[in-house]
């Protein structure tokens, strides 16, 4: 009896705009980090019932900054967003209809050197935007206000422009030192109102303004990015989007970025100390419109990190002019958010996220030995003979690593299975996840171990006659994805947002009813190119034997987010595009498994199951039979017909049905 499991990830997100604007006071108004303060919220500024709060249970969600308004840390007693810690509960005062919270900042935030802190008011479960606006409170009697430009801002200028800087401070006169790219360009020993104009700027500038009063020092940082103009130059043939290594010269690599509507792009990285000059402005190919740049002087075997600084001087409303992003075709990504949670025991010698940078960066390394495959001619089990064991690496064993699976290969062999299906291992947001919140489809997530460990696992499976199938979520991508971020709608200007109206890859609103994340538009040529590159990468680089395509109902452009009937009926556009993706997979590997999690109508699934079946191909379809099997386990005869676990019942010419009684998306029927 075949036991095949999978995950059906149909998550509909319902977000209700329930944010409220509260009024508040902080007493005393001026305080140091080691003084007790009281935050008071006016009860009449909150409609508790909007948040389904009926017992005056409101909570403070806090975070703190250092003296330079950087290095954000969450309050250690926040709890989780959907379950605030009781330590952060406000005290309700019925006589005055106020909510109060008293604390000492250094104790509350468990740090010193606090320059400011932020907080918001929320319901215990903040899901659905049950929160107030963000509130920022300054700490200390000495404060610096950077009037022009904004703190942490990047200003885009034409070459030769002047740039004005002004700031004020509290607490009396202070000493000001302005540095650009590490060199002091102006000082003022005693003032409370500072101003300076930097003239004739021709290169990118990273500024620091150091303000000292007594023993207190506050540093403000900001930058200028120079528009280098459009550098038109034909790109040599043979280069793909992403990194193309020069196999004849390991000191060189070519970077290619497809960024329509963008005016210019810089490459910033460890090879230029994250201070790109005009030499690192990407050229634009006149035929394709793609940006490209050849890197020289690289050391063979050394890991470099880089990202693109992508600029659109007149973006659409709510889109940022500057986006810093990793390469969409990254095969190894470093993350300021996730990497601190990956232990060295799981990923030895992991490249380090570059200090002082923001957002994900891509790792580039020329030369070096590739993985030495022991099996290069694996003969896959026949489609009709597959016995698939689904694995979520995170939950398989305590260490949550590929090594866990490698160490248990005998366990898999003894079970009698002949295929392992890995739930998504592509770079996803966070460290502990099912993996369907994918951000970088060509990068292996580091939380489970190095990419060579994944290859070792696949190689070992092949040595034991076990195929490896990869679960892929290519109907959507999440917000860290570079193709979302380069054309994002960011009304809050916080660096996060969904696709804007000019996004060439994603729909602004999902075109099917089961969407999660950002919905790919698979009728766009660029999306199709991206998907095919992903397919090629995992087949050729990782020797993956097949893909289980998640939520294939989402590959249509014909429906709306609220029209479930449309989503569930036959759609010609997704039939055609999914056949095209299957054909491409088979062009790389004629025996490749193509498996769809569609759960649709027989007439649509027949199109795929019978497609090229006379050539030994045909697409396999998941067949959920949980309910009738469950009826049988309870001894009931009603609705207990399991006839549809067979392919004939669905009109399939050959055995192309992956029938199952249970999956991890369903309750288990047996233990």
Placement of each model-derived feature along the sequence:
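Solvent-exposed segments in extracellular or luminal domains encompassing
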Residues: 190-206
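Short, solvent-exposed loop/linker segments at the N-terminal edge
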Residues: 29-35, 152-161, 246-247
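Exposed beta-strand face motif in extracellular beta-rich ectodomains
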Residues: 113-119, 203-207, 302-306
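Basic K/R-rich, polyanion-interacting modules in nucleoproteins and related proteins
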Residues: 224-265, 317-385
